[in-house]
Each structure stands twice: as C-alpha cells, then as structure tokens.
Amino acid sequence: MFALGSFKTFIGKCREDSVARNQMEAKCRLATAALLVRVATVDSDISEVRSKQLHRILRSRFGLDDSSATQLVEDAHAAERSAIDLYQFTRLLNRALDDKGRHQVVQMMWEMAYVEGRLNGFEANVIWRTADLLGVPSRQRVEMGQQIAAERSILASS
C-alpha cells in the first residue's frame, strides 16, 4: 500500500512539473515575441514585411501553426505595449534559458531587424540593450548581426 501511495505522489508531481514546464515555455515564447515586436515597432508601426517576418520566425522557431502564431503576436503586442522596460522580458528569459537559448533570442531579433535589408539606430539600440540584459557578450552580439546582415545581402542580390 505504501508503494502505491508513493507512486501516486510521484505521478502527481510529474504532472505538476509538466504543467509548470509548459507554462514556463509559454511565458518564454511570449517574452521572446514581445522583444521581437519591440524591434519591429521601435521606429514606426509594424510594416507588412515585418509582420510576415514576425509570424515566420515564431512559426519556425517555436513550431507553431498560423493560428497559434497569430495569437502569440497579438499577445506579444499587448505585453510590449504594457511593458515599462525590457527587463521584465529578459529577467524571465535569463531564469529559463541557457546561454544557447539566450543567444537564439538575440539572433531572432537580428533576423527581425534586418528583414527589410537595413538596420537603423533604434533597432540596433534595442538589440544591444537586450543582449546586454541577457548576458550575451558584445562580440557575439556584433558577430550575429554581421552574419544576418551578410545573409540578407546575399539573398537580396540573388
């Protein structure tokens, strides 16, 4: 009888851990999407090209269908509008992601910034501040940006 009770406790704990993990993943997706929205809108309203890129990034990186990506974008716009600063997003991502995950967030931001083939100072500043808050070294941040810029110029000339 004792073993059965312990097993039930173990199963209950596994379910709780699974729910908590799913909730944390959803929060990380929202925080990442909100940072991408910040990059996309920092200098103006979001253009159609940027909107499509935002959906594309979220679908490919998080394995979302169109409906889920659209809902995440709507939620991200609301979260970004109500945010006082970047810290509320980066604090969560720092707790939940390893170095590789934090680097991927910065890479997604570069992909968002360079979608139209150019980078402005506002976008660069948001990426710099976010990377700094995420603990991504300046050299790696710059290298990621240069790599994305090179890829964009190759695609644009093709």
Identify the function of each model-found stretch:
Residues 1-38, 42, 47-158:
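Small-residue-enriched hydrophobic alpha-helices in membranes
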